[in-house]
Regions:
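Mid-protein regulatory/catalytic core that forms ligand/cofactor-binding pockets
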Residues: 1-63
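Alpha-solenoid helical repeat architecture
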Residues: 2-6, 38-46, 77-87, 118-129
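"A position-specific structural signal for the A-helix of alpha-solenoid helical repeats
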Residues: 6-10, 46-54, 86-97, 127-130, ...
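Short helix-adjacent coil turns
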Residues: 15, 58-62, 79, 92, ...
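Alpha-helical positions within canonical tetratricopeptide repeat
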Residues: 19-22, 62-66, 100-107
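Amphipathic alpha-helical segments of tetratricopeptide repeats
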Residues: 28-35, 68-77, 109-120
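Structured C-terminal portions of repeat-based eukaryotic scaffold domains
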Residues: 61-75, 81-90
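C-terminal non-catalytic interaction modules
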Residues: 100-155
Length: 155
């Protein structure tokens, strides 16, 4: 039920790796997903969001990438856009933190802008704040051709 998923999803980042794997095995695929409402599915799939986010805060980017790989083979209904947007945000944030490549940073910003344009300002603001916390003190790893140019001309 909704509350069963909530009891597991909310503290997800606190579980050990073994506990997470056991829970993933039991929770997914969601049984009778087509019979569940959007709220219940958001909470169920939110488990992935919480375990990935927890690893990012621990700076365990390799583990976050492992969890992203697991969720990539999980079928999440298309109408659960909240989860899809969050996973896209977390995937690009993880890869930015892992590689420092500017293209991932730009994609994070694009996802946040998209969410804001859909009217979910609260979620977008939360993502901006989280991104600033997680990227504080980081420098960009600019790829060839992606660095800013200053053209100096004489008058």
């Amino acid at each position: 039920t909704y509350y069963d998923y909530q009891m597991v999803t909310n503290p997800a980042a606190l579980f050990s790796e073994n506990e997470v794997l056991q829970i993933l095995e039991q929770m997914f695929p969601v049984k009778d997903a087509e019979l569940r409402d959007t709220q219940t599915l958001n909470v169920a799939y939110g488990f992935y969001l919480n375990i990935i986010t927890g690893e990012l805060y621990k700076k365990n980017y390799a583990k976050a990438r492992e969890y992203l790989a697991l969720v990539s083979v999980t079928t999440i209904p298309a109408e659960i856009y909240y989860i899809h947007f969050n996973l896209r945000y977390l995937k690009n944030l993880t890869y930015y933190l892992y590689t420092g490549k500017m293209r991932y940073y730009k994609e994070v910003i694009a996802v946040i802008d998209m969410i804001e344009s859909f009217g979910d300002v609260r979620l977008a603001e939360g993502m901006k704040k989280e991104m600033l916390q997680l990227t504080a003190g980081r420098t960009f790893n600019l790829e060839k051709g992606q660095f800013p140019l200053n053209i100096v001309t004489e008058k």
